[in-house]
Amino acid sequence: GADRVLVLDNSQIGPIFGRGVGQALAEAVRGANPYAVLFASTADGRDLASRLAARLELGLTGDAIDLEIDAEERLVQLKPALGGNVIAPILSKTLPNLVTLRPGLLTPATPEPGATATVDQLPAAPFDGRDVRLLKEEFQEDQVGLVLANAPVVLGVGMGFGGVENLAKIQEIARSIGASIAITRDVAHAGW
């Protein structure tokens, strides 16, 4: 488990990972000098990892599917290549290693009884230069189904489904069997 946890309260910065969060994380990484910094391959994780890599002038391996330690105790990052037909081993030329990992890839470690971690607060201040800002925030409360990663059943909708007029049917079926609905990129771009 973790021996030390760094917490960044971004309530003063805002809900998105802009330069203020990147700056605070970069200062923490410089101070701690870790061997590796791992991020989830989510929109926020990729954004923050790339900001950190740029600020610290480090390499970044994106969307790794596994990690190994080789005989020389180097972190080997395994990444799909050539359309997923090959798994390429990546060795960083810079330290710390920065890696984004696909969500759900790692199995949580079994906690050690009685183990504790120190919790340190990272200072955060709004970035005083130009930054990303949130223009509009919307919440959709009537979503049907479960998060795809946790869904026991997923119904897929592609362009062959016919059109937006047929979506009510698939939503009804999904509700009746407790399924989530996934759509292809073409369907999303069509605005169904």
Residue ranges and their predicted role:
Residues 1-192:
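N-terminal glycine-rich FAD/FM-binding segment characteristic of electron-transfer flavoproteins
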